[in-house]
């Protein structure tokens, strides 16, 4: 259920910065036939600046509108808050919850283990750990992941450390049914080669059909085609991180006529200079004329 190409969805906003639910529906129409599941209300969905009510409403809307499996963002640096969010995401109709490692307070490995264990004990839906040290200031090590994999409803990890040795070690030392998903578009193909099962993707918001083509080529054993697609998509992977995510991907969606709106403060719109670079890449992929 949770393999393949899974977009980390943007949350489109209206001019007054309220959530644009019609925009979400429009983006779902663009995504659904190309992707395997959906992640609303994560980092790319600007969860950090959504109210609790908005957060849950976005997850609920996606779960009710789409026929695809939904992994709802539910992380917090407070264990009590993460438990509450995970319960609410479950009630909203998500098939799984994704929990970023607690940030800022920097717990040690035992604290991280107890955090995830506590959340897992309070919900019945599967949980995916989200490791992104560049944002949280803390790394989920292979040793810790091995322990977490023993908890019944922790089914996998979104790995965005960028450390292929660590990723390889996680795959090597966890059970075969433990799912590792790339959290870095550029590393999707290398991680698939190591035994990863897919990607939670920013680029899939923009080019879901091309991400699907790369993934399916790999699964079908056409490694040469998968490699060609990786190289073709690399400029997109790069330009979508020319500024803080999701600033560039929102600009790309605007240029393509999809729903995005401006990011909420403290994030600001992409500069004109960087916007031109986004345009060039979109044109090269025939996503805009």
Curated annotation (Swiss-Prot):
Active-site residues from the entry: 130 (proton donor/acceptor), 158 (schiff-base intermediate with substrate)
GO BP of this protein: diaminopimelate biosynthetic process; lysine biosynthetic process via diaminopimelate
Site, Part of a proton relay during catalysis: residue positions: 43, 104
Reactions mediated catalytically: L-aspartate 4-semialdehyde + pyruvate = (2S,4S)-4-hydroxy-2,3,4,5-tetrahydrodipicolinate + H2O + H(+)
SMART domains: DHDPS (SM01130)
Positions that bind pyruvate: 44, 200
UniProt key word Phosphoprotein: no
Subcellular location, record wording: Cytoplasm
Keyword terms of this UniProt record: Amino-acid biosynthesis, Cytoplasm, Diaminopimelate biosynthesis, Lyase, Lysine biosynthesis, Schiff base
GO CC term (a single one): cytosol
EC number(s) reported in the record: 4.3.3.7
GO molecular function: 2-dehydro-3-deoxy-phosphogluconate aldolase activity; 4-hydroxy-tetrahydrodipicolinate synthase activity
Subunit and interaction comment: Homotetramer; dimer of dimers.
UniProt-recorded name of the protein: 4-hydroxy-tetrahydrodipicolinate synthase
Organism of provenance: Archaeoglobus fulgidus (strain ATCC 49558 / DSM 4304 / JCM 9628 / NBRC 100126 / VC-16)
């Amino acid at each position: 259920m949770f393999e393949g190409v899974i977009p980390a969805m943007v949350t489109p906003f209206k001019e007054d910065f309220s959530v644009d639910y019609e925009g979400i529906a429009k983006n779902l129409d663009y995504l659904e036939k190309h992707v395997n599941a959906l992640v609303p209300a994560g980092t790319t969905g600007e969860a950090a600046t959504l109210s609790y009510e908005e957060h849950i409403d976005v997850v609920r809307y996606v779960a009710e509108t789409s026929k695809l499996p939904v992994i709802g963002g539910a992380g917090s640096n407070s264990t009590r808050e993460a438990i509450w969010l995970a319960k609410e995401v479950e009630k909203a109709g998500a098939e799984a919850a994704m929990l970023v490692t607690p940030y800022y307070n920097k717990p040690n490995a035992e604290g991280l283990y107890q955090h995830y264990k506590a959340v897992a004990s309070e919900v019945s839906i599967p949980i995916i750990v989200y490791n992104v040290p560049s944002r949280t200031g803390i790394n989920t090590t292979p040793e810790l992941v091995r322990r977490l994999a023993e908890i019944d409803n922790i089914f996998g990890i979104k790995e965005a450390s960028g450390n292929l040795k660590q990723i390889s070690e996680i795959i090597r030392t966890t059970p075969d049914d433990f799912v590792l998903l790339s959290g870095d578009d550029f590393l999707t193909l290398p991680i698939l080669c190591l035994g990863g099962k897919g990607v939670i993707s920013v680029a899939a918001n923009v080019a879901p059909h091309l991400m699907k083509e790369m993934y399916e080529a790999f699964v079908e054993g056409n490694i040469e085609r998968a490699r060609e697609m990786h190289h073709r998509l690399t400029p997109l992977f790069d330009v979508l991180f020319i500024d803080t995510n999701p600033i560039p991907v929102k600009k790309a969606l605007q240029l393509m006529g999809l729903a995005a709106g401006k990011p909420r403060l403290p994030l600001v719109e992409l500069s004109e200079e960087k916007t031109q670079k986004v345009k060039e890449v979109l044109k090269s992929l025939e996503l805009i004329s």
